């Protein structure tokens, strides 16, 4: 038996929709059904309490974590699906999640493909579009059946959505939900990290699709602070895969070997592994707390790339990734030479740096300022600043030949465009206006 534990925090209408959802999709004879209510609507509580086919845990005043823990203790199913009421998961999707969990030893929790490790999944794009392949519950049911034919799963370092299947006993052994957190995103992230610490990976099932009614996920600044205190890590910074860099790599190359400098908690390396399970993935990360997470799925070491002495790595890598790293180095010129020696013949580096020639920097200087910030081009931790030309020169001096140069841009207002046009009129003929639009430069360069 599977237990369905549905978390509600809204009004009477949400409660009515939740009842209909369970009644139409999860029959009482096959599933144990639990409502966990943590809202403030007495009418919703009364309605749910009168439902003879489900058990209600009234968590008003107790908090989400404590109420879900009570439901976990009460549940009888070997597996339990915890889901916020904003997610609609059809039985076909649940079966796909069960299938992937059963096919791998030691799996902790399985989530649907709301979001994949390397960005928004194609099915989520479809559901968000106006021409989504379903318009009602019946259409969603058919679509879920089609998607459920897909096999396979991707590893996740963390999940954000409160919609996951887990073994009840595994959750109990882990200690359940951490009551130091009060919102679902950090409750889920915390579960994932504790499971990884126990060497029990988290998966996203490719055949499971969930519709999400609410686009916004609630974030609590107090939970963010509690998370930093507990783990010494920051969400999302430490957990975001660099999909912009991965898009320029041949991830299917046989015997692929990748090194990421500044890999944080390893989300990008894990995305490489998902795309190519045979890939050899390595990381360099100075933050020991982040490295401890990444070491569960990659070979990660704390090394200084400016004084790198790793002869066993010479000529080893197809790709070396440096996503927003170079600007933090004291001697990026020596570091790049050291890293170039680690590439195979024809191997590539993929590097991104903020563009100090962005129009916003000019605007600030014309106002008489050069103000360091907590993030962005003038991040207070940046030691070096680059234009496109200086980045290319850095790579050239390390024996690397640029093959692809591409900018990242930020939204620009009409006033911004007018200011850029004024600046562009002052540029020499060999410097293009694109230099002013680029917020960041990314370069793929091959070892000569």
Q: Which residues does each predicted region cover?
A:
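Conserved N-terminal segment of class I S-adenosyl-L-methionine
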Residues: 217-315, 319, 333-336, 367, ...
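Short aromatic/hydrophobic "clamp" motif used to bind/position activated sugar donors
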Residues: 80
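Short, acidic, metal-binding catalytic loop of nucleotide-sugar glycosyltransferases
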Residues: 20-30
């Amino acid at each position: 038996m599977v237990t369905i534990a549905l978390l509600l925090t809204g009004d009477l209408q949400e409660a009515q929709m939740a009842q209909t959802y369970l009644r139409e999709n999860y029959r009482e004879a096959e599933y144990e059904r639990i409502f966990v209510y943590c809202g403030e609507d007495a009418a919703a509580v009364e309605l749910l309490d009168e439902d003879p086919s489900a058990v209600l845990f009234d968590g008003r005043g107790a908090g989400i974590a404590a109420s879900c823990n009570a439901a976990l203790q009460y549940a009888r199913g070997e597996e339990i699906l915890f889901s916020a009421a904003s997610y609609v998961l059809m039985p076909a999707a649940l079966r796909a999640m069960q299938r992937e969990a059963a096919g791998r030893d030691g799996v902790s929790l399985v989530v649907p493909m709301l979001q994949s490790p390397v960005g928004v999944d194609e099915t989520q794009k479809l559901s968000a579009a106006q021409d989504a392949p379903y318009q009602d519950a019946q259409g969603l049911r058919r679509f879920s059946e089609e998607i459920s034919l897909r096999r396979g799963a991707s590893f996740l370092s963390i999940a954000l959505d409160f919609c996951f299947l887990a073994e009840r006993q595994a959750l109990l052994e882990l200690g359940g939900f951490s009551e130091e957190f009060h919102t679902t995103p950090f409750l889920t992230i915390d579960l994932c990290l504790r499971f990884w610490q126990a060497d029990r990976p988290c998966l996203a099932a490719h055949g499971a699709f969930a519709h999400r009614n609410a686009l916004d996920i609630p974030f609590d600044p107090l939970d963010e602070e509690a998370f930093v205190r507990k783990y010494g890590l920051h969400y999302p910074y430490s957990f975001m895969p660099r999909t912009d860099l991965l898009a320029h790599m041949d991830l299917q190359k046989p015997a692929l070997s990748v090194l990421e400098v500044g890999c944080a908690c390893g989300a990008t390396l894990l995305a490489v592994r998902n795309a190519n399970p045979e890939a050899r993935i390595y990381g360099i990360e100075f933050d020991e707390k982040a490295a401890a997470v990444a070491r569960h799925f990659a070979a990660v070491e704390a090394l200084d790339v400016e004084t790198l002495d790793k002869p066993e790595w010479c000529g080893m890598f197809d790709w070396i990734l440096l996503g927003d790293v170079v600007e933090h180095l004291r001697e990026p010129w020596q570091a790049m030479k050291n890293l170039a020696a680690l590439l195979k013949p024809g191997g590539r580096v993929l590097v991104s740096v903020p563009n100090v020639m962005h129009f916003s920097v000019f605007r600030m200087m014309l106002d008489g300022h050069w103000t360091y910030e907590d993030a962005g081009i003038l991040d207070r931790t940046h030691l070096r600043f680059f234009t496109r030309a200086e980045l290319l020169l850095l790579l050239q001096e390390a024996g690397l030949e640029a093959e692809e140069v591409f900018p990242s841009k930020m939204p620009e207002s009409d006033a911004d465009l007018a200011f850029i046009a004024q600046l562009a009129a002052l540029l020499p003929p060999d410097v293009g206006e694109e230099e002013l639009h680029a917020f960041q430069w990314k370069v793929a360069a091959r070892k000569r």
